[in-house]
């Protein structure tokens, strides 16, 4: 065979292969049926996946910590760490593998990283993916992921593995895939980063459905239009070339504006952070405030017939995705790397500024300290404006979904939810500080030396006195 797939299958090996090394024998048997250049595609949970440390139950048995404790109470199903799996590959005939890491897991992957393209700091921030069982919430996974990434430990603690296995080392071109398919079919795409034989990386946006091809091809036109608009602020646009139904873009290197701001925040340089952030807010205003804003039918179709101020300004073309995560800073230039959500009709510049602030300030808890600096107010955005922009953003997200029902929107209806352990801990800690203090009278009125304290246990105290 050219390909053999083992998707959520390999872990059951010891249930039906009766041998001393069932998982090794499993791969030995399967690999005999491959062509010389054939591949095994294997997807499986990582026994040491971070989600299990954070309070998700083991996928097959539904119990807490079963896998990370080495399956002390169960038999018949086993998952493996990366080190353990490498040992199995070697014993099974020195098989070679290309390693990929689906996130949040291989069942509902939204991104797939690899050793050649690991996640960036702050990229892994999904919380609501336990659709089948109740989970504990022991810590903020996003912040722990950042710690693992900075210590080169992510491959050991990724939630799932996707392996391309062969008798020779597989040469797999994609190094990263992001799925944007929780959308209306006409907008459903995926983004792929591939590596050529010479090591050069390229980015490609591909329609997931045939009727999304027009959406992808339109990126070529948008690129040309934005290039002229952004030139006045010395901002470059990631070059786009349309090839068939795909959009091919440059792979740009550097640091995102988001990461730059985060570094300043971590160093306590908040004044410098604010100055840098607002320099880009001013660029947006300079580019997008060319004429008074008036609603168009196209605007209402996407953002709704909202009640906007009369003094807003705009341009004919509006890139609402000009947010810090999409701006790359390199030594000698500033570039916009993603401009998919550019509309060829006017959108108020203030909404673009609102999105810049919101998508930086509100999506990471560590940035909460910046809220006291009143970025919205300093940008001229009033509380009543925010209410309207929240409605616009909601309508925009509904436009993207169309008739599609996203899994994330069904979480509240499907999932048993989560138990917030920190809240429980704080509650119990507060109880531990609540004490009953009893004084006895030695003729000195209230005297701390003549007293005893008792801790409440489950809201009660029981004690005895010898009289």
Question: What is the role of each PLM region?
Answer:
Residues 335-425:
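C-lobe/activation-segment region of protein kinase-like
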Residues 84, 98-193:
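Rossmann-like AdoMet/SAM-dependent catalytic core
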Residues 61-72, 299-368:
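Catalytic activation segment of kinase domains across protein kinase-like and atypical kinase folds
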Residues 19-39:
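A short glycine-rich, Lys/Arg-flanked "PGG" loop and its adjoining helix->strand segment in the class I
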């Amino acid at each position: 065979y050219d390909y053999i797939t083992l998707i959520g299958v390999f872990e059951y090996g010891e249930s039906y292969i009766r041998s001393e090394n069932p998982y090794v024998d499993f791969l030995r048997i399967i690999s005999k049926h491959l062509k010389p250049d054939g591949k095994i595609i294997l997807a499986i949970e990582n026994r040491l996946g971070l989600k299990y440390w954070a309070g998700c139950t083991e996928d097959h048995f539904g119990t807490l910590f079963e896998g990370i404790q080495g399956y002390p109470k169960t038999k018949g199903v086993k998952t493996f760490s990366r080190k353990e799996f490498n040992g199995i590959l070697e014993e099974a005939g020195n098989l070679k593998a290309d390693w990929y890491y689906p996130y949040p897991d291989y069942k509902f992957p939204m991104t797939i990283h690899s050793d050649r393209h690991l996640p960036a700091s702050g990229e892994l921030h999904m919380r609501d993916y336990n659709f089948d069982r109740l989970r504990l919430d022991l810590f903020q996974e996003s912040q722990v992921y950042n710690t693992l990434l900075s210590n080169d430990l992510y491959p050991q603690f990724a939630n799932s593995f996707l392996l391309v296995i062969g008798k020779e080392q597989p040469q797999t071109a994609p190094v990263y895939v992001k799925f944007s398919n929780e959308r209306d079919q006409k907008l459903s795409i995926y983004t792929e980063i591939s590596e050529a034989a010479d090591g050069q990386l390229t980015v490609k946006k591909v329609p997931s459905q045939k009727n999304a091809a027009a959406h992808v091809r339109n990126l070529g036109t948008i690129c040309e239009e934005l290039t002229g608009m952004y030139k006045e602020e010395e901002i470059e646009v990631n070059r786009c070339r349309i090839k068939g139904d795909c959009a091919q873009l440059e792979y740009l290197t550097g640091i995102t504006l988001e990461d730059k701001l985060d570094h300043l925040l971590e160093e306590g340089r908040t004044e410098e952070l604010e100055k840098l952030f607002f320099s880009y807010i001013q660029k947006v205003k300079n580019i997008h405030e060319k004429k008074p804003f008036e609603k168009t039918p196209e605007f209402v179709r996407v953002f709704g017939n909202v009640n906007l101020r009369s003094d807003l300004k705009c341009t004919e073309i509006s890139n609402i995705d000009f947010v810090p995560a999409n701006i790359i800073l390199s030594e000698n230039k500033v570039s916009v790397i993603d401009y998919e959500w550019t509309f060829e009709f006017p959108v108020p510049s203030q909404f673009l500024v609102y999105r810049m602030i919101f998508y930086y300030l509100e999506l990471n808890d560590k940035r909460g300290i910046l809220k006291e600096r009143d970025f919205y107010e300093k940008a001229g955005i009033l509380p009543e404006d925010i209410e309207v922009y929240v409605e616009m953003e909601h309508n925009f997200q509904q436009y993207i979904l169309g008739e599609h029902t996203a899994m994330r929107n069904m979480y509240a209806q499907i999932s048993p939810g989560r138990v917030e352990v920190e809240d429980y801990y704080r509650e119990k800690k507060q109880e531990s500080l609540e004490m009953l203090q009893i004084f006895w009278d030695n003729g000195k009125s209230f005297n701390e030396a003549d007293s005893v304290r008792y801790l409440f246990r489950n809201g009660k105290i029981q004690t005895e006195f010898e009289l």
